[in-house]
């Protein structure tokens, strides 16, 4: 029985239940309890995932689609929990915790295998590590873009009043672009290590991943150029950011999903 996975699922659920009162009330007690529950969930999630990705013995690493998705969600949740502990980014927590809960549940109760042996190819280990960090970073940037769009829409339609709990739009936009820049640097390193260490990068098996990753990189470069040189703001930067995240998701997971559906 995956005890730590079940504990993580319960802790994520408790944290989600506590986030709503934490958003509606200024009492910090709800928020502290939500953060404590989230930390418990993250620790249990990490232990459960370690057991799934690194099984006993020299049997390699199980980098199945669900395991990788759960690992990415763990990385995103860890970053957003740290941000929330500083009383920022609370509007995004229900999304990231629900995403992590669903990913972990699927990885636990619908297990599958995709065994690799990264210990024999350290270059590939670096490449995969960079790809995970770049993807998680750019997904967080996309979440900030969605938060920016939502608050902007609510204010323009007079559905949301200004209050001390709501972050300024300019502050969210600055953070979004700062995170996007970090993600683009990591994505650039990912593409470079792929060229060096993946000898079959442009084979039939990997051509879709390579092309879509390059397209996503180009979208982000255009976004940053448009913002810093042409002054792009508002909906345009949101659409570019979300489009880049969608294309990158298709690059990282699209072919694996199709392969598993076929098999």
From Swiss-Prot:
> How is this protein positioned relative to the membrane?
Multi-pass membrane protein
A Pfam cross-reference name:
Cytochrom_C_asm
The residues that cross the membrane are 4-23, 35-54, 64-83, 90-109, 124-146, 182-201, 211-228, 237-259
Q: Which InterPro entries match?
A: Cyt_c_assembly, YpjD/HemX
UniProt main location, coarse: membrane
Q: Name one GO biological process term.
A: cytochrome complex assembly
Q: Which residues lie on this side of the membrane: Cytoplasmic?
A: 24-34, 84-89, 147-181, 229-236
Q: What is this protein called?
A: Inner membrane protein YpjD
Q: Which gene encodes it?
A: ypjD
């Amino acid at each position: 029985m995956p005890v730590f996975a079940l504990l993580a699922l319960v802790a994520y659920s408790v944290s989600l239940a506590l986030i709503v009162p934490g958003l509606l009330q200024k009492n910090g007690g709800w928020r502290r309890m939500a953060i404590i529950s989230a930390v418990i969930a993250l620790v249990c999630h990490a232990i459960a995932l370690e057991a799934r990705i690194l099984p006993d013995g020299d049997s390699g690493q199980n980098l199945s689609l669900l395991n990788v998705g759960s690992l990415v969600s763990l990385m995103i949740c860890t970053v957003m929990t740290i941000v929330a502990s500083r009383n920022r980014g609370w509007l995004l927590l229900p999304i990231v915790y629900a995403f992590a809960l669903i990913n972990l549940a699927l990885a636990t109760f619908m297990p599958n295998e995709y065994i690799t042996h990264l210990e024999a190819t350290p270059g590939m280990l670096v490449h995969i590590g960079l790809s995970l960090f770049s993807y998680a970073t750019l997904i967080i940037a996309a979440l900030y873009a969605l938060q920016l769009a939502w608050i902007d829409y609510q204010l323009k339609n007079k559905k949301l009043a200004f209050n001390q709990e709501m972050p300024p739009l300019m502050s969210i936009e600055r953070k979004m672009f700062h995170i996007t820049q970090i993600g683009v640097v990591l994505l650039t390193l990912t593409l470079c290590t792929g060229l060096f260490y993946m000898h079959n990068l442009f084979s039939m098996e990997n051509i879709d991943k390579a092309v879509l990753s390059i397209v996503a990189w180009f979208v982000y470069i255009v976004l940053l150029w448009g913002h810093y040189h042409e002054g792009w703001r508002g909906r345009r930067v949101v659409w570019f950011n979300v489009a880049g995240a969608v294309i990158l998701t298709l690059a990282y997971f699209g072919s694996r999903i199709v392969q598993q559906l076929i098999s």
